[in-house]
Amino acid sequence: MNIDKVKKLIEKSKRPVVLAGTGINISDTKTELFRFVKKNSLPIVTAWSHDIYPNYDKFYYGRQGSIGNRVGNFVVQYADLVLVLGSRLNIRQTSYNWKEFAKNATIISVDIDPLELNKNLIKIDYKIQMDLKNFFIKINKLI
């Protein structure tokens, strides 16, 4: 999938959400994530890594999954587009009923690890194997 398609899906979406994971810390892209969310006015939830996005920001809806809060989980479940950035989408995020995870959403996952992108649990509609630094460079040129 090319980055232009991601841009178009974000623009078309009525209820998008960014789900950011530990990959943001590993790739040292907190600043890029913050700019991307602000520039596009996108709701954001985080996985286990509660330190990757400021919890005082108006676009932050909390954590998602079994360790998350109600609002964070609602935002994901009722989204029509989930942009997963650097998250494994493990069982604590998706629950044991992973087929119901964001069931009405188009899911785009950006991860450097092909094994995480190709797990047989979550339905990922668009898989982008790419370092998050490169992803943010490319997407920010388009949006």
Where is each model-derived feature located?
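Cofactor-/ligand-binding subdomain signature composed of acidic, glycine-rich
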Residues: 1-14, 138-142
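Serine/threonine-rich low-complexity intrinsically disordered regions
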Residues: 2, 31, 38-39, 97, ...
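Glycine-rich, charged/polar anion/phosphate-binding loops
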Residues: 2-6, 32, 69-70, 92-94
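Glycine-rich, acidic loop regions that bind phosphate or pyrophosphate groups
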Residues: 50-143
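Short, functional N-terminal and low-complexity linear motifs
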Residues: 2-3, 40-45, 102-109
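Anionic-ligand anchoring segments at beta-strand to alpha-helix junctions in alpha/beta enzyme folds, i.e.
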Residues: 9-79
